Amino acid sequence: VASTELQLAQGTRTVLSDTEVDSTAAAGLVTLKRGTDHMKINNPLVKESSFIFITPKTKTNQNLFLLDQKEAEDEEKGSFTVGVDGKANDDIKFNYLIVN
């Protein structure tokens, strides 16, 4: 890919709850809230074959990992879920990047 200005984060983002967000962007910043153990990101770009990269922006001793990944089916949106080992001790901000 050659680009002088690749804008992957263009799109909309709507917070639905402490553990769920709707997004249409290929990249974004999400906060996993203190006291929770996962964050679901609904996104129409997610496919079974997508590579999803997660990068913490907050210093943490807890591990973030891809817990689940689902392609859109019928009326259901595609989604992926990021988990953390145990309940988050503090808010954990992380970037995501969806590559198809």
Show which residues each predicted segment covers.
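Extracellular receptor-binding modules and their adjoining Ser/Thr/Gly/Asp/Asn-rich linkers
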Residues: V1-N100
